[in-house]
């Protein structure tokens, strides 16, 4: 085997897994459907499925009991999906940590990685769309991504009916 063949094989395997996940997500979006795991089991199982498909290992900590309001579940799922996808595509990270907790009438999300940082709301449509969606629901989103030090994305989404109707 030529030098570096094992590393290349691992990278190709990761790329194939990532592309398969993206194609599945695109199919669901094109049909206007939520991921099956989200519709059937709620946020925890859906994020578990997302983590298993990720090209970068995901340490998942979900502190949510029962179902959240649909708007909050969908927004939380897509916020995590966007952050994990960006990590896999741009960060050169070796790990991602996803923390989700619902308490005090809000859901808190934190997605952090050990990548190269440099993420910015001004670059690319994914983060801009995510920011717009979170703010349209009355939520808050913060991005800390200094070059060379990884990225931390914090999202707070309200669970009350008034903010949900802002959609």
Residue positions per predicted region:
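Coiled-coil dimerization/phosphotransfer module
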Residues: 1-167
């Amino acid at each position: 085997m030529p030098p570096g063949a094992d590393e290349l094989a691992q990278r190709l395997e990761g790329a194939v897994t990532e592309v398969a996940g993206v194609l599945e997500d695109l199919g669901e979006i094109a049909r206007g459907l939520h991921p099956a795991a989200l519709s059937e089991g709620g946020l925890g199982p859906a994020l578990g499925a997302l983590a298993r498909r990720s090209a970068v290992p995901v340490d998942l900590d979900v502190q949510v009991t029962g179902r959240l309001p649909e708007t909050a579940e969908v927004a939380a799922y897509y916020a995590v999906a966007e952050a994990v996808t960006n990590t896999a595509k741009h960060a050169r990270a070796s790990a991602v940590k996803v923390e989700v907790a619902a308490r005090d009438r809000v859901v808190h999300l934190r997605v952090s990685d050990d990548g190269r940082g440099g993420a910015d709301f001004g670059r690319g449509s994914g983060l801009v769309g995510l920011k717009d969606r979170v703010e349209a629901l009355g939520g808050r989103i913060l991005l800390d991504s200094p070059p060379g030090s990884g990225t931390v994305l914090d999202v707070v989404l309200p669970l009350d009916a008034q903010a949900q109707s802002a959609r």
